[in-house]
């Protein structure tokens, strides 16, 4: 299933991602640091969403209380809740 998440507090404005059950199939960030976000996307594709959440949740960017990886974790949590 495909999801769209509007981020908050980051340079990236939106995350589009696809889950097959709990498996992350694809992730595309809109805005933000293109190279870094492509890297994050490639690293989590094929990963179990719960494992990605565990690894990414709570990461901060500079003085911000969140980051693009943290926002991805929040988006994945919301998607998993919707699947229940």
Question: Each predicted region: which residue ranges?
Answer:
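Short, hydrophobic/aromatic-rich segments at coil-to-beta transitions
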Residues: 1-4
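Active-site- and interface-proximal helix/loop "cap" or "latch" segments in soluble metabolic
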Residues: 6-14, 19, 23-84
């Amino acid at each position: 299933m495909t999801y769209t998440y509007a981020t908050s507090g980051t340079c990236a404005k939106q995350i589009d991602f696809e889950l097959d059950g709990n498996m992350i199939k694809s992730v595309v960030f809109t805005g933000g640091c293109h190279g870094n976000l492509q890297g994050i996307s490639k690293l989590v594709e094929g990963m179990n969403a719960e494992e990605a959440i565990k690894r990414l949740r709570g990461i901060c960017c500079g003085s911000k209380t969140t980051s693009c990886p943290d926002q991805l974790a929040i988006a994945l949590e919301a998607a998993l809740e919707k699947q229940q």
